[in-house]
């Protein structure tokens, strides 16, 4: 645990001491946890046009570099780190999916420059990177500064609650990935 000590003199010259602690844990760090009561049934869409997605999405900074998915100009964006490869997740609210059915998936993505950025889209039964093991869009490297649509399908083997995760996984010292207009069609 890393402690930060803060001291300040009051007007009466008395000393006050404040203590705050931050934890440096070696596991995934969740900034926002999914808060809706019931899983959503597709069709489902999210534009990321404003900050409201932060209320229902789970954001995980797996490499703990303090760079994470954030609202940016009508999108969700993840930026680079000059020392660590990107390893950051943007995970949907819980979705109620039927086994044996196919759901269409699409998302618009662009990069912040001409650097190759890498992403993948996965789904699974929990909102953790370890559970998001089923590919919707395989790991893909892109470099374009206009939004382009990427598509895939979600085909769960069994019925239940599932999550979809957009994984920013670019090499270190690139620039940024921005996403908008995520859509999951009805079965």
Predicted segments with their positions:
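Extracellular beta-strand-rich recognition modules
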Residues: 48, 92, 101-111, 119-121, ...
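Extracellular beta-rich ligand/substrate-recognition surface
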Residues: 77-88, 140-144
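Short beta-strands within extracellular/lumenal beta-sheet-rich domains
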Residues: 84-100, 149-150
């Amino acid at each position: 645990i890393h402690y930060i000590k803060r001291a300040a003199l009051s007007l009466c010259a008395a000393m006050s001491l404040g203590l705050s602690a931050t934890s440096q844990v070696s596991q995934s760090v969740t900034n926002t946890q999914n808060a809706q009561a019931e899983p959503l049934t597709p069709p489902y869409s999210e534009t990321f046009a404003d900050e409201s997605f932060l209320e229902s999405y789970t954001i995980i900074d797996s490499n703990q570099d303090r760079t994470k998915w954030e609202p940016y100009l009508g999108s969700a964006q993840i930026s680079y780190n000059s020392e660590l490869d990107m390893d950051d997740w943007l995970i949907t609210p819980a979705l109620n999916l039927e086994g044996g059915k196919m759901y269409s998936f699409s998302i618009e993505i662009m990069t912040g420059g001409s650097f190759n950025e890498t992403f993948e889209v996965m789904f699974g039964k929990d909102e953790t990177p370890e559970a998001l093991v089923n590919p919707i869009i395989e790991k893909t490297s892109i470099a374009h500064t206009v939004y382009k649509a990427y598509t895939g399908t979600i085909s769960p083997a069994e019925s239940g609650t599932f999550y979809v995760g957009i994984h920013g996984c670019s090499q270190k010292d690139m620039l940024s990935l921005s996403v908008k207009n995520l859509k999951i069609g009805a079965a």
